[in-house]
Amino acid sequence: MSFLLHQARFFTTVNHLRDLPPSPQPEVAFAGRSNAGKSTAINILCNQKRLAFASKTPGRTQHINYFSVGPAAEPVANLVDLPGYGYAEVPGAAKAHWEQLLSTYLQTRSQLRGMILMMDSRRPLTELDRRMIEWFAPTGKPIHTLLTKCDKLTRQESVNALRATKKGLDEYRAAGYQGELTAQLFSALKRIGLDEAHELIESWIAPGLAGDPDGPVAAE
């Protein structure tokens, strides 16, 4: 099966809000803790080995990377790789810059269609994961959680992690969050959940071009 995300390439790097590209194409943001496997997940979703890079020093990369998707001459969307968060040794000034950059981007970017939130399946819904959800909540846009590294769990542990995450997301629904909140298990190493994630992301950015000929299917 051919997926639109497989036509991805580096576009630009942004370190300040004023440098965000003015392009009107829809965007999907990828967020997650520094050790949640975000870069690896982006690479496997785009069927490339070195599209997204993880910093050698976790938490030190404080800029936003853009990857254009679709034909090179006429891209149809952008994937937006946000800085990883949660690394204890990040200096205070860098952390403040990160918080300002991410929170403002997530809350005000009109091109943004939704957020893919990466969580380590062994430690889902940390305090900082919840902060990301709460930053994004006022927009009413969808959040889809990838519970990464699920290959490190037993089948029952995976079931429990997914159930606990969905229960946690239900709390935001009960509190009045208007956007769609979904979650799935994911493993870049074992290629678990790839088709499900592909179809959902492409349903956000280009429903008519999604890889499933019968239309994209959203995760539960």
Swiss-Prot record:
<comment type="function">
    <text>Necessary for normal cell division and for the maintenance of normal septation.</text>
</comment>
<protein>
    <recommendedName>
        <fullName>Probable GTP-binding protein EngB</fullName>
    </recommendedName>
</protein>
<dbReference type="InterPro" id="IPR027417">
    <property type="entry name" value="P-loop_NTPase"/>
</dbReference>
<keyword id="KW-0131">Cell cycle</keyword>
<keyword id="KW-0460">Magnesium</keyword>
<dbReference type="GO" id="GO:0005829">
    <property type="term" value="C:cytosol"/>
</dbReference>
<keyword id="KW-0342">GTP-binding</keyword>
<feature type="binding site">
    <location>
        <begin position="59"/>
        <end position="63"/>
    </location>
    <ligand>
        <name>GTP</name>
    </ligand>
</feature>
<keyword id="KW-0479">Metal-binding</keyword>
<feature type="binding site">
    <location>
        <begin position="148"/>
        <end position="151"/>
    </location>
    <ligand>
        <name>GTP</name>
    </ligand>
</feature>
<feature type="binding site">
    <location>
        <position position="39"/>
    </location>
    <ligand>
        <name>Mg(2+)</name>
    </ligand>
</feature>
<keyword id="KW-0547">Nucleotide-binding</keyword>
<feature type="binding site">
    <location>
        <begin position="32"/>
        <end position="39"/>
    </location>
    <ligand>
        <name>GTP</name>
    </ligand>
</feature>
<dbReference type="Pfam" id="PF01926">
    <property type="entry name" value="MMR_HSR1"/>
</dbReference>
<feature type="binding site">
    <location>
        <begin position="185"/>
        <end position="188"/>
    </location>
    <ligand>
        <name>GTP</name>
    </ligand>
</feature>
<dbReference type="GO" id="GO:0046872">
    <property type="term" value="F:metal ion binding"/>
</dbReference>
<feature type="binding site">
    <location>
        <position position="61"/>
    </location>
    <ligand>
        <name>Mg(2+)</name>
    </ligand>
</feature>
<feature type="domain" description="EngB-type G">
    <location>
        <begin position="24"/>
        <end position="207"/>
    </location>
</feature>
<dbReference type="InterPro" id="IPR006073">
    <property type="entry name" value="GTP-bd"/>
</dbReference>
<feature type="binding site">
    <location>
        <begin position="81"/>
        <end position="84"/>
    </location>
    <ligand>
        <name>GTP</name>
    </ligand>
</feature>
<keyword id="KW-0132">Cell division</keyword>
<dbReference type="InterPro" id="IPR019987">
    <property type="entry name" value="GTP-bd_ribosome_bio_YsxC"/>
</dbReference>
<dbReference type="GO" id="GO:0005525">
    <property type="term" value="F:GTP binding"/>
</dbReference>
<keyword id="KW-0717">Septation</keyword>
<dbReference type="GO" id="GO:0000917">
    <property type="term" value="P:division septum assembly"/>
</dbReference>
<dbReference type="InterPro" id="IPR030393">
    <property type="entry name" value="G_ENGB_dom"/>
</dbReference>
<comment type="similarity">
    <text>Belongs to the TRAFAC class TrmE-Era-EngA-EngB-Septin-like GTPase superfamily. EngB GTPase family.</text>
</comment>
